[in-house]
Curated annotation (Swiss-Prot):
Residues 1-22 form the signal peptide. One of its GO terms (molecular function) is cytokinin dehydrogenase activity. FAD binds at A87, G89, G91, S93, Q97, D150, T155, S161, I165, I216, Y460, S495, Q498. Pfam families: Cytokin-bind, FAD_binding_4. One of its GO terms (cellular component) is extracellular region. Its cofactor is FAD. The gene is CKX2. It catalyses: N(6)-dimethylallyladenine + A + H2O = 3-methyl-2-butenal + adenine + AH2. It comes from Arabidopsis thaliana (Mouse-ear cress). This is Cytokinin dehydrogenase 2.
Length: 501
């Protein structure tokens, strides 16, 4: 009889969940959390945008509040049944960084909210909110964030845990540089508010901290006036030095007479050349140009505005059309709504989805390269590796940004060099499962070339598998990074998919 009472007590106290892969996680009923082991939910949480890895969690929770996450982490840190936890937004990682084998995935998209302050200078945003929804909500009040990633259908928390880069970085810095305050739940389950003045060690740690010190649940994002429209240009170059010289000149110009967005793209003759931005009458000319030269460089810029009749708009257009050294005749301009410009990649996503090409593996390689070595990088990587690849599929981005827009106190890394300008490189290739090893081999060859040539690159959205590589990556920040882990997540529960600790 005593044994029966004990069994009943145990059943009452514990909610025992066993996933389809045989991994068991015990959560006390008092936590009032529902751990889903539905096969479809587990399957979705086992994969990410990279479509390269499969890592199966023990279960997934959809929190109704930040308190749910706090209770989960307190139990994981202090309970008898220790398990690891990973926060996951849209799963836009490339190599399982937001995964946890046998542990618990916290579906951050279950917590969304955008509240604009009365003075419209900032918005308090729940970490599971998509950037596109932040844009929609803030634009209703005539304001918007000042820096953006190219793709807006990703979560605020996930982006800030990595850095957040795009074509506005040269002007306003990465997304992590435009945060005033955060709410974070540490690996001990503590719910803390942090900023540059309050708990700064946590604030600087989690921005670009790869989820190692806590789960961001709220971010206070800087806002400014939301322009109505954008004049969007693309210009073609056949000479790399001329191309980069014009890029660097544009990012050095003052705000009022300069552009608001700048990126660069590389067209390769062994890849797919998207000529759709240009008028139909010019598209065959663009394609022929790429065939003729092998490599063509695309300067892409935008100027935001409200009133097209303002003199400054004409002045900027004159600067672009009359003083830059692009190939004569190879310039195209679109006039689009501000929202449509920022959401442009989603349009391309829908096209790829309709063709069944979105769910392919994405062996992307993202790098920061010092300005002083960008020509060496171009010659050794673009000419001698990418152009000689059997076929290139996807985008190759290359554009400069100003180093002073980054805050070195944050975990986010860029090359530790004494230079004012660094280049952002995005080799955004896709591959069939059959071709994946070839593309991964190309990426390895690129990294090896940079190391052998002494080019002090830093990777972005990286995935290392050895502690030595992580120590090298964080460089002078490693000691602080390691100490912060011991301080805020001493049991190493958070974001194990990064393979750091």
């Amino acid at each position: 009889m005593a044994n029966l009472r004990l069994m009943i007590t145990l059943i009452t106290v514990l909610m025992i969940t066993k996933s389809s892969n045989g991994i068991k996680i015990d959560l006390p009923k008092s936590l009032n959390l529902t751990l889903s082991t539905d096969p479809s939910i587990i399957s979705a949480a086992s994969h990410d945008f990279g479509n390269i890895t499969t890592v199966t969690p023990g279960g997934v929770i959809c929190p109704s509040s930040t308190a749910d996450i706090s209770r989960l982490l307190q139990y994981a840190a202090n309970g008898k049944s220790t398990f690891q936890v990973a926060a996951r937004g849209q799963g836009h990682s490339l190599n399982g960084q937001a995964s946890v084998s046998g542990g618990v995935i916290v579906n951050m998209t279950c917590i969304t909210d955008v509240v604009v302050s009365k003075d419209k200078k900032y918005a308090d945003v729940a970490a599971g909110t998509l950037w596109v929804d932040v844009l929609k909500k803030t634009a209703e009040k005539g304001v918007s964030p000042v820096s953006w990633t190219d793709y807006l259908h990703i979560t605020v928390g996930g982006t800030l845990s990595n850095g957040g880069i795009g074509g506005q970085v040269f002007r306003n810095g990465p997304l992590v540089s435009n945060v005033l305050e955060l709410d974070v739940i540490t690996g001990k389950g503590e719910m803390l508010t942090c900023s540059r003045q309050l708990n700064p060690e946590l604030f600087y740690g989690v921005l670009g901290g790869l989820g190692q010190f806590g789960i961001i649940t709220r971010a206070r994002i800087v806002l400014d006036h939301a322009p109505k429209r954008a004049k969007w240009f693309r210009m073609l170059y056949s000479d790399f030095t001329t191309f980069t010289k014009d890029q660097e000149r544009l990012i050095s110009m003052a705000n009022d007479i300069g552009v608001d967005y700048l990126e660069g793209q590389i067209f390769l003759s062994n890849g797919v050349v998207d000529t759709s931005f240009f008028p139909p009458s010019d598209q065959s000319k663009v394609a022929d140009l790429v065939k003729q030269h092998g490599i063509i460089y695309v300067l892409e810029v935008a100027k935001y505005y409200d009133d097209p009749n303002l003199p400054i708009i004409s002045k900027v257009i004159d600067t672009l059309t009359k003083t830059l050294s692009y190939l004569p005749g190879f310039i195209s301009m679109h006039d689009v709504a501000y929202f449509d410009f920022l959401n442009r990649v989603h349009v391309e996503e829908n096209k790829l989805r309709s063709l069944g090409l979105w769910e392919l593996p994405h062996p992307w390689l993202n790098l920061y390269v010092p300005k002083s070595r960008i020509l060496d990088f171009h010659n050794g990587v673009v000419k001698d590796i990418l152009l000689k690849q059997k076929s290139a599929s996807g985008l190759a981005l290359l554009y400069p940004t100003n180093r002073n827009k980054w805050d070195n106190r944050m975990s986010a890394m860029i090359p530790e060099i004494d230079e004012d300008v660094i280049y952002i490189i995005g080799l955004l290739q896709s591959a069939t499962p059959k071709d994946l090893p070839e593309v991964e081999s190309v990426n390895e060859k690129i990294i090896r070339f940079c190391k052998d040539s002494g080019i002090k690159i830093k990777q972005y959205l990286m995935h290392y598998t050895s502690k030595e590589d992580w120590i090298e990556h964080f460089g002078s920040k490693w000691d602080d990074f390691s100490k912060r882990k011991d301080l805020f997540d001493p049991k190493k529960l958070l974001s194990p998919g990064q393979d750091i600790f």
